[in-house]
């Protein structure tokens, strides 16, 4: 069964960030679902969603998008069996202090923190590549392409 990434946003204002992640997941051939739920405002709704996804017999992980006070990432990570990747949206408010709510988690709660949407999708792909050859091949091709671009850019400077 093909892996699934559940992109869980704290609110609809995070849709642009979610779409960037989804676009990158497509390049790796990874199926995804985009959902909305707030750990602060709709905790029961989030639990219901997580139970639904956890019942699926397929590889899955969660990418959470929540700004301001990011309780969502820790909440999800504490509930699910697999990996959670926190990818909070950028914020200029309060000199970017929102990020601190994604950095410190209680013991036993360990969402990975990745700030760039493309890199959050790449981490998901790399996790799934451990047991999915198609995704592993996509990741390898992606990494080789990035490396080749650097080499080409360097060769232009050597002239």
From Swiss-Prot:
EC number(s) from the headed UniProt entry: 4.1.1.21
GO MF, one annotated term: phosphoribosylaminoimidazole carboxylase activity
Effect upon mutating residue 40 to N: Lack of activity
GO biological process: 'de novo' IMP biosynthetic process
Reaction it catalyzes: 5-amino-1-(5-phospho-D-ribosyl)imidazole-4-carboxylate + H(+) = 5-amino-1-(5-phospho-beta-D-ribosyl)imidazole + CO2
Residues bound to substrate: 11, 14, 38, 41, 67, 69
Pfam family, one: AIRC
EC class name: lyase
Record keywords, A-Z: Lyase, Purine biosynthesis
Pathway recorded for this protein: Purine metabolism; IMP biosynthesis via de novo pathway; 5-amino-1-(5-phospho-D-ribosyl)imidazole-4-carboxylate from 5-amino-1-(5-phospho-D-ribosyl)imidazole (carboxylase route): step 1/1
InterPro entries, per database record: PurE_classII, PurE_dom, PurE_prokaryotes
Similarity section: Belongs to the AIR carboxylase family. Class II subfamily.
Function: Catalyzes the reversible conversion of 5-aminoimidazole ribonucleotide (AIR) and CO(2) to 4-carboxy-5-aminoimidazole ribonucleotide (CAIR). Does not accept N5-carboxyaminoimidazole ribonucleotide (N5-CAIR) as a substrate.
HAMAP family: PurE_classII (MF_02045)
Name recorded for this polypeptide: Phosphoribosylaminoimidazole carboxylase
Organism: Treponema denticola (strain ATCC 35405 / DSM 14222 / CIP 103919 / JCM 8153 / KCTC 15104)
Lineage of producing organism: Bacteria, Pseudomonadati, Spirochaetota, Spirochaetia, Spirochaetales
């Amino acid at each position: 069964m093909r892996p699934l990434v559940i992109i869980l946003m704290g609110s609809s204002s995070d849709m642009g960030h979610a779409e960037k992640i989804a676009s990158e997941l497509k390049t790796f051939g990874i199926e995804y679902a985009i959902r909305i739920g707030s750990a602060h405002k709709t905790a029961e709704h989030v639990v219901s969603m997580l139970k639904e996804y956890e019942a699926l017999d397929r590889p899955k992980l969660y990418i959470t998008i929540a700004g301001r006070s990011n309780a969502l990432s820790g909440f999800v990570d504490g509930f699910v069996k697999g990996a959670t990747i926190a990818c909070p949206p950028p914020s200029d408010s309060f000199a970017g202090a929102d990020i601190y709510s994604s950095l410190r988690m209680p013991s036993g709660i360990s969402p990975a923190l990745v700030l760039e949407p493309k890199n959050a999708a790449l981490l998901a792909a790399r996790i799934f590549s451990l047991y999915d050859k198609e995704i592993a091949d996509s990741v390898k091709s992606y990494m080789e392409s990035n490396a080749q671009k650097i080499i080409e850019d360097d060769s232009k400077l050597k002239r």
